[in-house]
């Protein structure tokens, strides 16, 4: 099960807009940029994992764990554009640790509905 196309941020222009106009929150493993988007009624997700973190297998493992976390919480996330950037410590974490760390930083970024979390 994938996140549908409508839930993804792919265009460089969208990434740049969110970097400039969005708000950032970080912990040791992730940086999360959020930006309101009134044109859509659901969240959109962009993931950035630098080549400095490791080979393609490792980077894809991190991206899969991030996407899985958003799939699990899909109905509880506000309609925002969200970019998740993985930092160096994320490469040594298990999938469960990645999900716990990501949930922590997403709560700080206030992307969850108040009634759900």
Swiss-Prot record:
Cellular-component GO terms for this entry: ribonuclease P complex
SUPFAM superfamilies from the UniProt entry: Ribosomal protein S5 domain 2-like (SSF54211)
Pfam families: Ribonuclease_P
Catalytic activity: Endonucleolytic cleavage of RNA, removing 5'-extranucleotides from tRNA precursor
Keywords: Endonuclease, Hydrolase, Nuclease, RNA-binding, tRNA processing
Enzyme class: hydrolase
Gene3D superfamilies given in the database record: 3.30.230.10
Domain of life: Bacteria
GO biological process, one term: tRNA 5'-leader removal
Keyword Metal-binding recorded: no
Sequence similarity: Belongs to the RnpA family.
Cited PANTHER family: RIBONUCLEASE P PROTEIN COMPONENT (PTHR33992:SF1)
Assembly description: Consists of a catalytic RNA component (M1 or rnpB) and a protein subunit.
Name of the featured protein: Ribonuclease P protein component
Organism per entry: Staphylococcus aureus (strain bovine RF122 / ET3-1)
Gene that encodes the chain: rnpA
